[in-house]
Amino acid sequence: MTRMVANRFDLPEPIKISCIGGVWRYDEPQFARYRYFTQWDAEIYGVADPSADAEIIALSSDILESVGLKEHLVKISNRKLVEGFLRGLGIQSQNDLDHLIRIIDKVGKIGSEQAEREFTRAGLSKDKVKRILGFADISGDPDQVLGELEKKLPKGDMIHQGFKELSGTVDRVESLGKKPKIKVDLAIVRGISYYDGTVFEAYDQDGEDVGAILGGGRFDKLCKIYGKRDMPATGVAGGYERLMLSLERKDLFPDIQQRPEVFVVTVNESVWNDAVKIAQQLRSHNIRADYDLKQRPLGKQLEYADSLKVGICLVLGPREIKEGTVRMKDMKTGEEKSVKLSSAVDEIRKTLG
């Protein structure tokens, strides 16, 4: 989407855009991680203010609320804050910074002991490793964490810019009524290097082993790479497969009835076209209706209808067509009666309840 937006000078800003599509990534397939998955995205272009980040975070929370994942938590941080801290430790090479940020991104998955070994292999002293792990361990209530950080932050333009952006995002999230759903967690950095500001991930608190259900953040420099202009941007993306896994675990899939409510049975082939018309008429009244495409004998049709657990069978023959009636059979009670075709819809609804 960024490549498209970066070259569309005709679009009025701010640009709000979304898409859904298949995504490939080079990854080792494992629980809740896939090489191919279906992803949705929502992005805002042209706004540098934290209000855009807050709106994306609020949208993310609203999406999870709408599907029933009410016990979710959005963990937020800021890449400038983390990178500024690392630079304060004397790490200046961008390659080294990107490598260390990727390790921080894995702390929650691999644990602090494994992360310590990876930091040590990267050439860091024990003191620096301890300080980085301590920094990444900072998390909690936004007001409390930001209050403590403000007192203890080391000097540096980048780290203070990151703090300003993060604080501004929290303020605006509060205005959108979503502050109870967020938590500051400095271990959230998003491992992809194009993120350069506020970042976040959302988890179902009852199933964090699934991983982040969605995540995103600010990527202000990406438009310049794909187009001819600088344009601030922020967004969010999520995979349908992980979302479905979380919903399935909590039995949150809606109870959508797939089987027909009414099955139109024909006495012989001569009335088959009439049965098709009746079924279609019932469908036009939002009654799930079906008929036997295989045109089997009456007994086989009734057996098939019973296997589908339909509520009602309409039995149609030449006499019923002549009289403008149909025999309506309640499949639960076995009761059968003749009804006028003109009143069949009302009779069916009464029986189905």
Map each language-model feature to its residues.
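Short, conserved phosphate-binding/catalytic loop or strand-edge motifs used
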Residues: 34-40, 76-84
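Phosphate-rich ligand and nucleic-acid binding surfaces
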Residues: 84-91, 109, 126
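Hydrophobic mid-domain F-helix/FG-region of cytochrome P450s
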Residues: 59-65, 80-89
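Acidic, His- and aromatic-enriched active-site or binding-groove loops in soluble protein domains
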Residues: 91-112, 204-206
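Positively charged, Gly/Ser-enriched RNA/tRNA-binding surfaces
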Residues: 3-70, 118-353
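Internal, well-ordered alpha-helical segments in soluble enzyme and binding-protein domains
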Residues: 56, 78-81, 99-100, 165
